[in-house]
Curated annotation (Swiss-Prot):
The gene is rlpA. This is Endolytic peptidoglycan transglycosylase RlpA. Lytic transglycosylase with a strong preference for naked glycan strands that lack stem peptides. It comes from Rickettsia bellii (strain RML369-C). PANTHER family: ENDOLYTIC PEPTIDOGLYCAN TRANSGLYCOSYLASE RLPA. One of its GO terms (biological process) is peptidoglycan metabolic process. The lineage of its organism: Bacteria, Pseudomonadati, Pseudomonadota, Alphaproteobacteria, Rickettsiales.
Length: 227
């Protein structure tokens, strides 16, 4: 009887230790159900980042001037729209920094933030949040601060409505780590952006994890659902 209680006590201590390890992890959550294969299901062959790092020069659209920059901190509140519906003309086309737009990935377009970068977008109506990779410019319609992919609109639960009031938070530290993980060199690509040469492609740090997989891993780190 005593031996049985002792075994149960040891098992209980081990279980508590395991839970503590999961909660204190600074990496991704300990859940083993999220394999790299599963997280890469939307872009399994997207192991090479097709774009390059770009801040860009001042530009004008519809009479309004925009000044791209690379801030350390940035927040913005306003309305989000989404693009990438059925027959959408943007799906499969190049973005402002040479990447390829895919409506099924966790991406977004912003007028001034560096490309690519990570932002946390929160739907102010339902408090749903998701971390997205900004890889394009826009939106240029009045009263809209960000365009998100069709998939991101689903996660934020405003796809049917078309618009949602959101808060954007630029994640500077996470962006720096993300750029290293997908092998994007900021210093070398600044010059490439000004030239006619196409930047050379290099595989991501983990060749079992696609670009979208790396975005999802950051979401899981912040305990945000992405499926």
């Amino acid at each position: 009887m005593m031996n049985h209680k002792f075994v149960l006590l040891i098992l209980l201590i081990f279980y508590c230790f395991f839970l503590s390890g999961c909660n204190n992890s600074k990496k991704t959550p300990c859940s083993r159900k999220h394999s790299h294969k599963e997280l890469s299901k939307d872009d399994p062959h997207n192991l090479v980042y097709k774009g390059y790092y770009k801040v860009g020069s001042q530009y004008k659209i519809k009479g309004k001037t925009y000044k791209p920059n690379a801030p350390k901190s940035f927040t913005e509140t306003g309305y989000a729209s989404w693009y990438g519906g059925g027959g959408d003309k943007f799906h499969g086309k190049k973005t402002a920094n040479g990447d390829m737009f895919n409506k099924n990935l966790l991406t977004a377009a912003h007028k001034t933030l560096p490309l690519p970068c990570l932002v946390k977008v929160t739907n102010k109506t339902n408090n749903k949040s998701v971390i997205l990779m900004v890889n394009d410019r826009g939106p240029f319609k009045p009263n809209r601060i960000i365009d998100v992919s069709a998939k991101a609109a689903e996660v934020l639960a405003f796809k049917k409505q078309g618009l949602a009031k959101v808060k954007i938070e630029y994640l500077h530290a996470e962006t720096e780590k993300f750029l290293k993980n997908i092998k994007v060199n900021k210093s070398s690509n600044k010059t490439l952006a000004k030239s006619s040469k196409k930047p050379s492609s290099t595989k991501v740090a983990n060749n079992k994890c696609s670009i979208n997989c790396h975005i999802k891993l950051v979401n899981l780190k912040y305990k945000l659902a992405v499926n």
